[in-house]
Design a protein with these regions (language model features):
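Catalytic strand-loop-helix junctions within cyclic-nucleotide turnover domains
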Residues: 1-12
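Internal hydrophobic scaffold segments of catalytic domains
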Residues: 7, 15, 19-22, 93-95, ...
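Short alpha-helical basic/polar micro-motif
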Residues: 10-11, 18, 88, 199
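Catalytic/regulatory signature loops of cyclic-dinucleotide turnover enzymes
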Residues: 11-37
């Protein structure tokens, strides 16, 4: 409400609907310029994660990746194993479709360093599997698919600048949606009932392709993300 044009009011309404659905669907959300107000939602939410939803999202993800040549994947700043494992899972999905794929990494902290080294030291994996912020900015253009995992807030993404360089953004996350959203995502799968981003990716991979085969390192990363993030 209170937008300067009908088009802006429509955009406010669309964002409010996405927020309400992302927070469980039992709240009314009002967006008044930069102010977000929530009403209701006192009842406990019931688990809604279903195989049907995962299958639909998996097919949609396959369509978007399949229709583009380059895929860039990133998680959140200060990458943890859940974010990293989810990114690796999406990387494998892209490679199954013979697409160029890259994972954006900034500073590599101790919690994932050993995992990153497993791939860097394995000649089966391309040298450009991991790219820096600078490299990502050079790679991404309007025809690149940018997949964001384990966060739905633009300010928390590993390299937020590339969100403005593409027209095709996919968001896969298990955190509740806040008032800060990634705008213009062509596919948004936000499931607060999932224990981890890796759990969501594991479900998606089941339906992504019949012939998908994870290598041992990849499966270990995804499993570690599920175990550690669930315990946290």
């Amino acid at each position: 409400m209170n937008g300067s044009t009908y088009a802006q009011n429509y955009e406010f309404s669309r964002i409010a609907i996405e927020l309400a659905l992302g927070r469980g669907g039992d709240q009314a959300v009002v967006k008044d310029n930069d102010k977000i107000s929530y009403y209701g939602g006192k009842s406990q939410q019931m688990e809604k994660s279903t195989r049907v939803k995962a299958r639909v999202k998996a097919h949609a993800l396959r369509e978007f990746i399949g229709s583009h040549e380059d895929v860039v994947i990133m998680g959140h700043k200060i990458t943890d194993i859940d974010s990293f494992g989810a990114a690796v899972g999406v990387w494998r999905a892209a490679r199954i479709l013979d697409k160029k794929a890259h994972i954006v990494l900034g500073d590599i902290n101790g919690s994932i360093r050993q995992w990153v080294n497993l791939f860097l030291n394995d000649k089966e994996y391309p040298e450009d599997m991991f790219v820096t912020h600078e490299q990502a900015r050079k790679i991404v253009d309007h025809d690149t698919v940018v997949v964001v995992v384990d966060t739905n807030r633009p300010s928390m993404t590993e390299c937020s600048e590339i969100l403005n360089q593409t027209r095709t953004i996919v968001v896969l996350d298990h955190h509740r949606q806040s008032s800060e959203v990634i705008k213009n995502a062509v596919l948004s799968y936000i499931e607060p009932y999932a224990s981890s981003a890796c759990e969501m990716i594991a479900e998606i991979l089941q339906y992504f392709a019949d012939d998908i085969r994870l290598k041992g390192k990849e499966a270990d990363c995804i499993y570690a993300g599920i175990i550690i993030d669930t315990n946290n």
